[in-house]
């Protein structure tokens, strides 16, 4: 295994084989142990008490090939329901609760978009997909996107002009859902940023049309299986952290307390496999994903992307990835940090400038979603990692 020395500046770029993750001390990772101790303590504090930020959480952080923090806090399942009349959570008896562990899978929500984006860039690398090609060249039956000249790049950068979402969960069947997607025109000016789940749904259809394979197969065969991410897949996932007592009026469907079934209503309506949501994973598996991208697309003997195409992913404004967003990246933002958040409480950040990564998975929607999400704990955790680098 290559030594740690020199890995931080290079990130493993250009290596035919990149080192795998291994557990180690903060000092071995080149991180300040005091800051990481505070990171862990704060995650525990935010899962404690009567009204915690999240019922439970898993935090994973490291630098280079060294995994320096892997900690679980709180509960994977704490609540039986949400009481609408009293506006309070209904606690399970202590014996019926399920503790959080570092191996607990989470509903990734929009972190799924990162895997869809990597799958797309893999096809760009192979020459089967053109980044500036028009969607209509691959999906002529998606008449609205074809008529307005929407491009693959616009889907990946959320600049297609498509609205944030459609009520696919209210459609009678798959045929009606597909007809709605095919007929949906941009409502904004193409080239203007507007975050939209529809971009990734159209991209899913492009990928499936180009390859003749379903998205779950593309992700499994092209990303998770080569990297040994055995805990990452589309649901159902029975052992996952619970999400929401999903009921109207605060949600868009009446499904009750969810555990192991995709939380996103549109992904659920689409059968659990969707370009914008549907994956489940663990903190360690996502650390492998981050490490692979930091190492230029390689992990051990596996290579999922070439270094130039990892660069393409992270070229501003980013393909699928958000870049330098302090609202959830804290002080890691500023030198090309990349990442994403998920509605269920998930997030990850990787910083190529310092060869560091942070995965924070929390079930913040258990037992009910907040009206306004609280992103401060995500930013605070990332700031701890940034300071752990600076103080070494």
Predicted regions mapped to residue ranges:
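Active-site SXXK
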Residues: 37-44, 65, 104-132, 203-208, ...
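Glycine-rich phosphate/pyrophosphate-binding beta-alpha loops
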Residues: 272-278, 337-349, 363-368
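Short, gly/Ser/Thr-rich active-site loops of penicillin-recognizing serine hydrolases
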Residues: 84, 295, 309-316, 326, ...
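Short, surface-exposed loop or secondary-structure junction motifs
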Residues: 6, 13, 77, 82-88, ...
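A short, well-structured edge-of-sheet supersecondary motif
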Residues: 35, 41-99, 131, 157, ...
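Short, well-structured active-site flanking segments
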Residues: 68, 75, 95-103, 115, ...
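Short, conserved phosphate/pyrophosphate- and ester-handling motifs at nucleotide-, phospho-/glycolipid
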Residues: 32, 113, 282
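Short, contiguous pre-domain boundary segments
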Residues: 15-28
């Amino acid at each position: 295994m290559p030594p740690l020395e020199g890995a931080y500046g290079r990130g493993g770029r250009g290596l035919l084989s990149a080192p795998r993750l291994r557990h180690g001390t903060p000092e071995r990772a080149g991180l300040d142990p005091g800051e990481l101790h505070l990171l862990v303590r704060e995650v525990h504090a935010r899962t404690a008490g009567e009204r915690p930020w999240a019922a439970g959480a898993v935090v994973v952080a490291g630098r280079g090939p060294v995994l320096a923090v892997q900690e679980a806090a709180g509960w994977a399942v704490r609540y039986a329901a949400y009481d609408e009349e009293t506006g309070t959570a209904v606690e399970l008896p202590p014996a019926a609760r399920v503790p959080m562990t570092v191996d607990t899978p989470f509903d990734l929500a929009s972190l799924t978009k990162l895997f869809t984006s990597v799958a797309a860039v893999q096809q760009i690398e192979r020459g089967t997909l053109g980044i500036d090609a028009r969607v209509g060249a691959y999906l002529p039956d998606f008449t609205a996107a074809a008529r307005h000249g929407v491009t693959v790049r616009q889907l990946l950068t959320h600049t297609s002009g498509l609205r944030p979402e459609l009520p696919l969960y209210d459609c009678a069947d798959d045929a009606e859902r597909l007809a709605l997607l095919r007929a949906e025109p941009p409502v904004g000016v193409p080239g203007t940023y507007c975050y939209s789940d529809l971009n990734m749904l159209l991209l899913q259809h492009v990928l499936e049309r180009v390859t003749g394979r379903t998205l779950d197969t593309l992700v499994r065969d092209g990303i998770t299986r080569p990297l040994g991410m055995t805990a990452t897949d589309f649901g159902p996932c029975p052992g996952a952290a619970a999400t929401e007592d999903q009921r109207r009026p605060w949600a868009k469907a009446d499904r009750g307390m969810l555990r192991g079934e995709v939380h996103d209503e549109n992904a659920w309506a689409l059968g659990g496999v969707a370009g914008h949501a549907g994956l489940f994973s663990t903190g360690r598996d996502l650390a492998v994903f981050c490490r692979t991208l930091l190492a230029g697309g390689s992990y051990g003997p596996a290579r999922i992307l070439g270094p130039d195409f990892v660069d393409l992913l992270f070229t501003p404004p980013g393909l699928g990835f958000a870049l330098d967003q302090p609202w959830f990246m804290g002080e890691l933002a500023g030198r090309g940090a990349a990442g994403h958040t998920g509605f269920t409480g998930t997030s990850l950040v990787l910083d190529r400038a310092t060869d560091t990564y942070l995965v924070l998975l929390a079930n913040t929607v258990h037992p009910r979603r907040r009206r306004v999400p609280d992103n401060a704990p995500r930013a605070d955790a990332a700031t701890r990692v940034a300071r752990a680098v600076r103080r070494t």
